[in-house]
């Protein structure tokens, strides 16, 4: 094999909106409310190996806005990407898939959610940046804690 074939390779094959739903259970009455809504945001990351060097990474976001105890809207979206990753050492592969790939996908998710919210007739909500490295490290710590409690072997990966 030549040196070129052994070089680390990272390529975005595709970025796509995998799933999105928006519910407005209290429309149109909710539009008459004068109080500011409270907003809850949840984000999650999942990854799946599709082939030897091909991974699908999905960043999911859920935004719930409530006025008093009434739901103004609930939006759930999944932004996905297919990544071709080759010749990356195993110890670097999991962080690449768990940190770098979600960081690439999140701006698309944020834009799609903001667009859907405004198209639904609500003022825009802009999701703050997310530190996917901190999220990854938090999940890794949880897995290590679970592995220690269950007596699982070391080397368990997130993806």
Swiss-Prot record:
Identify the keywords attached in UniProt to this record, alphabetized.
Answer: Chaperone, Cytoplasm, Protein transport, Translocation, Transport
Instruction: Provide the protein's localization.
Output: Cytoplasm
Q: Name one GO biological process term.
A: protein tetramerization
The transmembrane segments are: none
Molecular function in Gene Ontology: unfolded protein binding
Is rRNA-binding among the key words of this record?
no
Q: Name one GO cellular component term.
A: cytoplasm
Q: Name one Pfam family in it.
A: SecB
Role this protein plays: One of the proteins required for the normal export of preproteins out of the cell cytoplasm. It is a molecular chaperone that binds to a subset of precursor proteins, maintaining them in a translocation-competent state. It also specifically binds to its receptor SecA.
The family annotation for this protein states:
Belongs to the SecB family.
Quote the NCBIfam families the UniProt record gives: PRK05751.1-3 (NF004392), PRK05751.1-5 (NF004394), secB (TIGR00809)
Describe its assembly.
Homotetramer, a dimer of dimers. One homotetramer interacts with 1 SecA dimer.
* Annotated protein name in UniProt: Protein-export protein SecB
Q: Which organism is it from?
A: Burkholderia vietnamiensis (strain G4 / LMG 22486) (Burkholderia cepacia (strain R1808))
Primary gene name: secB
